[in-house]
Amino acid sequence: MLGIARLSLLVGAGLLLAVGPSLADDASPPSSIDELLRRIRELEETGASRQRELERQQQEIDELRQQVGDNWLTQRRAEEIRNLVSDVLADADTRSTLMQDGMTAGWSEQFFLASGDGRFKLQVSGLQQFRYIWNFHDQPDRYRGGFENTRTKITLRGHVISPDLTYLIRGNFARAGGSFGLEDAWLRYHLTNEWNVRFGQFKLPFNREELISPAKQLAVERSLVNESLNLGRSQGIEMAYADEANRLSLAFSDAGQDQVGGFNLVGTNAQNTPALREDTEYAITSRYEYLAAGSWGQFNDFTSPVDEEFGLLLGVGAHYQQDEFTGRFSFGRNEERWFAWTVDVSAEWGGANAFASFSHHYIDDPSFGAVNVYGVVGQAGVYFTPKFEVFTRFEWGTFNIGIADFHDLYLVTIGGNYYFDGHDIKLSADIGVGLYAVEQPWDSDLAGWRIDGNSAEPQVVIRTQFQLLF
């Protein structure tokens, strides 16, 4: 330590000796020092200015923070927060309850609510069809057109106690008046994988065109032949068998809905009727289908998307009923007998489809004698893009009754469908032309066709429809 001190003193003395003469020659500081001091003062002033700016900005930030802290919780924001908290708590409580009960809910093609053990399930679905129809025929009121909610349906379905016991309840708001009416209400029990029994109110297993949902038709509406010759809904019991290639249904019911020609020849309508109503002694309906190629699921509609496999389906149906014996005095038989049969074939190629059917109804009426009605429907469609499809349909029908002579039905329809999301969201349009007069046995207000007079001009119907199925 002593050596270092001595060394420092020697270095200091040497420096004094070196600079001493210069200080003696000029007592004023050198210009380089003045410049250095000036720059130091400028830097101090700049630093002070920047410090003042920082202090001003900090003051503004503090004022803004104070304003935000005082004003952010306004009445509106407080209400929004309370609602949000309430919704979150309610949702959490619901989820907690469902979890405690083992229940599940959500969306899988349809809205559903189910028990955790799988014993109970409820599905909710709906259909809305909004339509515009324009009609021309050669009568004093030549042109008619307008909008309507053609179908507004709500369906509840699922199973109870076991997946083997299924149910369906469906209602529709009428397009005229808007009243709500029951359409289907049935229970089905699966005895085995192949056999099941159904009882309640349902469509009779007769012709394929009527059995296909209105949401999954090819044209805007079913054919006029179908509107006159289908059996509609009834109340009864049905046994059914289904395997990989065969389906068979046999129904014993109150009666078929008499829509043949619109003349009410048989006069039965068993939809939503009491048990002791005078209708028929008995009514039996049966349908058999053979799946030659493809899968059953692809024949739930008439179309065939471009990625679908080839399918071929053959079908035949029959119906027989005899009216109620009234016991009233008569010189002859007073019960009508009604026999009907139909055959059909459906083919799908993945981007193209075709369907054809032939139907015959025979009514033995005590007043009018034998009545024979025949109908043919042929239709086909092809996809131009994965979502756009064009189609055409031809209809022929003849109504033979001894007391009157009617023109045969000849009808051609062409149109297209655009599938935004399959059948769930679909836009359809078509135009139909009556090649001959459309007379009473075949007119249909639902389909947009009126009764023609004695006219050489064809009746024309233009229809557009937007559909939502969920």
Could you tell me what each predicted segment is?
Residues 256-275:
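Active-site-proximal beta-alpha loop/turn segments in soluble metabolic enzymes
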Residues 8-18:
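Bacterial N-terminal signal peptides
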Residues 22-127, 263, 287-290, 296-299, ...:
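N-terminal periplasmic/intermembrane-space "pro-region" immediately following the signal or transit peptide
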Residues 274-279, 334-338:
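Interfacial loop-to-helix transition and helix-capping segments at the boundaries
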Residues 91, 266-267, 299, 445-451:
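Intrinsically disordered, low-complexity Ser/Thr- and acidic-rich flexible linkers and loops
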Residues 1-9:
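Bacterial N-terminal signal peptides that target proteins for export
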Residues 104, 108-258, 278-295, 302-313, ...:
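Outer membrane beta-barrel
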Residues 140, 186-188, 210, 307-470:
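Outer-membrane beta-barrel pore domains
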